[in-house]
C-alpha cells in the first residue's frame, strides 16, 4: 500500500473525487481562469467551464487547462451558465456530487473538500458556503458594500431565514444528484442565488452551511464587488420576485 499524504487523507485524492464535478461559469476571465482550473484540477479532475459569451480568450485558456468546455454564443448571465454546466455534468457517467465554483480565484479547493466530505458523511443534499459562519477577523475582509447587500438579502427573504442561511449569495455550493436533477434556474442574472434558495425550500432539500474563506483580490474586486453589482443583486431579486 502506498503512503498517503495529508491532502489525500483529507479527501484530496483525485481518484476518490472522480464522482465530483466542478461547474465554473466564466465571462471574460481569460487572464486568470487557466490557473484557477489547473489548481482545482489537481484535486478534482472533472471540471466543466461554461464560457458565457466571453469576448476575450477565455475559451482558449479553458482548453489549455484541460477542462471540459461548453460555450454560450452570447452572454446569458451567471444563472444560465450554472444551469448549462449542471445539465452537462449530471449527464456524465459516475457523477454524484456537483460544485458551483467561481472562475476568478475567490473560491478555495480546501473548502470544497470539506463540503464534499460533509455530503458524503451527513444526511444533507446541499452545503452552501458562508462568509459569516463563525466569529473571525477575516469577516472584516468582506467589502463593506458586499456585507450590507448580503445582510439586506437575508433580512428581505423569509425563506432564507427559515432555512437558517446567513450568506445566500455565496457562489460556492456543493450538492448531490437529487439537487442537480431538480435544478431548473430560470433567472439568468445575479438573482439566481435567491432562486436557489426558493428551490431549496420548495423542494425540501436538506440544507447545511459551511464557513469558507473567500479570497478578495484586486482582480476579483474589479470584477464583481462594486456598488452597481450590489444594487443589481437586490433589483434582480425584487423585480424577478426572487426574494420570497
Regions found by a protein language model. Name each.
Residues 94-104:
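Short beta-strand-to-loop acidic/aromatic patch adjacent to the donor-nucleotide binding site
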Residues 26, 50-52, 72:
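Conserved sequence signature across two-component system core domains
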